[in-house]
Amino acid sequence: MGWRELAIWGAVAVAVANGLVGCYGAARWYRFAPSREFWLGVRAGQGLALAYAVLVAVLVLEHRHPSSSLYYLYALLPVAIGFVAEQLRLVAADQVLARDDLDDAQAVATLPAAEQQAIVTAILRREMGVMALAALVVCVLALRAAGTW
């Protein structure tokens, strides 16, 4: 397998992994069903995107260049998308608490158990939505990377 094939198949692997995770997460988000497997898949997809970015760096160091400079944008943006998605995920809890006029997590503890569970589920659902959407965006970018080598 040559450098070109390695770059293309690496991008396809990132696209498939993140596409599956994104679709699974979107389905679980729609059904209000938190999932441990989704979060493991998200982390695996992010790890694969990071490994692909390292491969791109190796290709640059080996003076193996794609046919289009856009390749670098499509190949490296998934790492940035993952970082931005994590930042948005961190804001999700604050948004849910603000929506329910709660100051902080300690204020949630004063609520009845059913309301606490509803707030936790709302936070998890919002986080899943953000990360599922990010995984789908990474999928599209990786497919574009494969097409621009």
Model-derived regions, located:
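Polytopic transmembrane helical bundles with strong interfacial aromatic enrichment
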Residues: M1-W149
